[in-house]
């Protein structure tokens, strides 16, 4: 048996663009992807902190150190430029693997620069 666990998270990223006329996906700064352990074409869940929307899409790599967080295609209707979002990916692990696993959690500032990188998330410890 396997269970689904949080693998990677980019917390409170700022949407820099919403491009309705592009073919699907979310474009993420490649540097942020690397630090958060998110791969190109990986499925991610997006949560918009400002409007409460939750949806899934896949990742394409943006220019390194650009700070780009761009929702493309139909997903562009779910956010607005300037919205704060949480980007999460998941993995399937056995119970034994899950008990030893820690996610990669990346906190960014208003310009999508890395503020903190951790391998845990505990209630009340990190805002």
Curated annotation (Swiss-Prot):
Keyword Lipid metabolism carried by entry: no
Annotated GO biological process: alanine biosynthetic process; pantothenate biosynthetic process
Entry annotated with the keyword Transferase: no
Record pathway: Cofactor biosynthesis; (R)-pantothenate biosynthesis; beta-alanine from L-aspartate: step 1/1
Molecular function in Gene Ontology: aspartate 1-decarboxylase activity
Residues bound to substrate: 57, 73-75
Source taxon at top rank: Bacteria
Cofactor: pyruvate
InterPro entries xrefs: Asp_de-COase-like_dom_sf, Asp_decarbox
Positions of modified residues (Pyruvic acid (Ser)): 25
Keywords: Autocatalytic cleavage, Cytoplasm, Decarboxylase, Lyase, Pantothenate biosynthesis, Pyruvate, Schiff base, Zymogen
Post-translational changes noted in the entry: Is synthesized initially as an inactive proenzyme, which is activated by self-cleavage at a specific serine bond to produce a beta-subunit with a hydroxyl group at its C-terminus and an alpha-subunit with a pyruvoyl group at its N-terminus.
Assigned EC number: 4.1.1.11
Reactions this protein catalyses: L-aspartate + H(+) = beta-alanine + CO2
Cysteines paired by S-S bonds: none
Cofactor binding note: Binds 1 pyruvoyl group covalently per subunit.
Subcellular localization(s) per the UniProt record: Cytoplasm
One Gene Ontology cellular component: cytosol
Top EC class, one word: lyase
Catalytic machinery residues: 25, 58
Xref: CDD domains: Asp_decarbox
Subunit record text: Heterooctamer of four alpha and four beta subunits.
Family: Belongs to the PanD family.
Function: Catalyzes the pyruvoyl-dependent decarboxylation of aspartate to produce beta-alanine.
Record-given protein name: Aspartate 1-decarboxylase
Lineage: Bacteria, Bacillati, Bacillota, Clostridia, Eubacteriales
């Amino acid at each position: 048996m396997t269970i689904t666990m949080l693998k990677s998270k980019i917390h409170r990223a700022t949407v820099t663009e919403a491009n309705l006329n592009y073919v699907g996906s979310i474009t993420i700064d490649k540097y942020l992807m690397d630090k958060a352990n998110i791969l190109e074409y990986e499925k991610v869940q997006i949560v918009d902190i400002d409007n409460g929307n939750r949806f899934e899409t896949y990742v394409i790599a943006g220019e390194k150190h650009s700070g780009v967080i761009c929702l493309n295609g139909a997903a562009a209707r779910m956010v607005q430029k300037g919205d704060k979002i949480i980007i999460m990916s998941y993995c399937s692990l056995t119970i034994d693997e899950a008990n030893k696993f820690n996610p990669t959690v990346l906190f960014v500032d208003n310009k999508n620069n890395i503020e903190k990188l951790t391998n845990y998330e505990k209630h009340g410890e990190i805002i």
